[in-house]
Structure formats: structure tokens, C-alpha cells
């Protein structure tokens, strides 16, 4: 049966995902940045209370995936911490300035991760040649690759995703970016073994007093009064589609 991974940005989101049928969680902070390394407090609380597999993201900042030496050193320290806390896997990715997988740094990441399953995230979609990148990641021992098929969303990139799947069984190709209940069946019919979804919704902040003339973000248009949450019903609907597909 296809595996459903849900991207979660808090302890509450992780609990919601687990209760509604998620098979695995990608744990992140900072949804507006596309996911950054969670805090130690969040890591510890999720490790204590969530029983399904959780893979924290290791990403020190938003933007591109070419990191300074200092940023990369911090990533290795975060990997060691995630390993010490007992997580079964992690999610990360590093590129060269030319859009290739940085194999030298990936070797160091794999050494630091040890027995943990490593997912190479959507830095893959920024690679100049996805098929060369996939071969390099297979050689590195990466467990899976999260990809939208190098398009803005996975529905647009499904043909490339299918080509990547045809390259072999490892790494596993996990489709993500815009995967929802209304298009999930297309991925299952295409033979995708793992899917990744945020299943998220923006909820209004409970704050009654609001200083509308002030923002904590450099983006003065940023909405300070909405919060990202995993929608349990969306997770359950997607899991139901997967179960019914398996029963065919």
C-alpha cells in the first residue's frame, strides 16, 4: 500500500496527522520558508508523544541549497542531535553552485546520519539534471527522494516522476508539492509508492487585540494573524483513497 507522509510544523499538527492515518511525518518549522530545522523543544516533545515515524528536516535557512561552511557545520550538528534523540530518519539536501548534488557533503551527511533513513528533499527539483542527480543519490545510499518532478507542483511534474520511478527501486521516489485528495488517485495509478502532502489550512489567530500597523516580518504585507494547521479531515480523506486503491 502506498505510504502517506504529512508535513507538520508543530506538535499539534503531528498529533492531528497521526490520529487521522498518516504513515509518517516530516517535521519542520517555518512554513513560510518552506520548512526549516525544528527547535530542540519541538523535537523532544514530538519524539515523546508521536508513535509513527517522524523525519525532521535539516535545513538551516530558507532560499537556495548551497550552504556556507558555517551553515553546513550546523547541519551536521543538527543531524547528530536528531540521531541522539532516536528519530528513525531525516530530510535534507545540499547542492553545488552549478545545481548538482554536492556529493562531498552528502558523504558527510550520510556518515553523520549513520543508520537513519535519509530523504533528499526538493533541492532535487533545483538540480540541473534530475537523472544524474538520482544516480548520484543512489550511490550515496539515500533512502528516498522527495520531488515534484521539477515543476511547481507534482501534478505538473508527474511525467518526470514516472520517468524517475522507472530508473529503479532505490531511492524511493516520493511525490510531493500540491498533492491533495482531488489528485491523489493520479499518483497512485502512476505507481507512486509514497506521497507527501501538507494537508494544511490557514486558521485565523485567536488574538483579539491586533496592532494592524506593525509586522514582525520584513514583509510588511505578511499576515501576522493566521496560523498554519494540518487539517485532520484532509489527512483522513487521503488515507481513505489509498486504502480503497489498495483494495481494488
From Swiss-Prot:
InterPro entries: CutC-like, CutC-like_dom_sf. Gene3D superfamilies: Copper homeostasis (CutC) domain. It holds the Pfam family CutC. Keywords: Cytoplasm. Its main location: cytoplasm. GO terms for cellular component: cytoplasm. It comes from the Bacteria. It is found in: Cytoplasm. SUPFAM superfamilies: CutC-like. GO terms for molecular function: copper ion binding. Homodimer. Belongs to the CutC family. This is PF03932 family protein CutC. It comes from Salmonella paratyphi B (strain ATCC BAA-1250 / SPB7). The lineage of its organism: Bacteria, Pseudomonadati, Pseudomonadota, Gammaproteobacteria, Enterobacterales.
Amino acid at each position: 500500500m502506498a505510504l502517506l507522509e504529512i508535513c507538520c510544523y508543530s506538535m499539534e499538527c503531528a498529533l492531528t496527522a497521526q490520529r487521522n492515518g498518516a504513515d509518517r511525518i516530516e517535521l519542520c518549522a517555518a512554513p513560510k520558508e518552506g520548512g526549516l530545522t525544528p527547535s530542540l523543544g519541538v523535537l523532544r516533545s514530538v519524539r515523546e508523544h508521536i508513535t509513527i515515524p517522524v523525519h525532521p528536516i535539516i535545513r538551516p535557512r530558507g532560499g537556495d541549497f548551497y550552504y556556507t561552511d558555517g551553515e553546513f557545520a550546523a547541519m551536521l550538528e543538527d543531524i547528530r542531535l536528531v540521531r541522539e534523540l532516536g528519530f528513525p530518519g531525516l530530510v535534507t539536501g545540499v547542492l553545488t553552485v552549478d545545481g548538482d548534488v554536492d556529493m562531498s557533503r552528502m558523504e558527510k551527511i550520510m556518515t553523520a546520519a549513520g543508520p537513519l533513513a535519509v530523504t533528499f528533499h526538493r533541492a532535487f527539483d533545483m538540480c540541473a539534471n534530475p537523472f544524474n542527480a538520482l544516480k548520484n543519490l543512489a550511490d550515496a545510499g539515500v533512502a528516498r527522494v522527495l520531488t515534484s518532478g521539477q515543476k511547481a507542483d507534482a501534478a505538473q511534474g508527474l511525467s518526470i516522476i514516472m520517468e524517475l520511478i522507472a530508473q529503479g527501486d532505490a531511492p524511493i521516489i516520493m511525490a510531493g508539492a500540491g498533492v491533495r485528495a482531488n489528485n491523489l488517485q493520479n499518483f497512485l495509478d502512476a505507481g507512486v509508492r509514497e506521497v507527501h502532502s501538507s494537508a494544511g489550512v490557514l486558521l485565523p489567530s485567536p488574538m483579539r487585540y491586533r496592532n494592524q500597523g506593525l509586522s514582525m516580518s520584513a514583509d510588511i504585507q505578511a499576515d501576522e494573524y493566521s496560523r498554519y494547521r494540518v487539517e485532520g479531515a484532509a489527512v483522513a480523506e487521503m488515507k481513505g483513497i489509498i486504502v480503497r486503491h489498495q483494495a481494488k
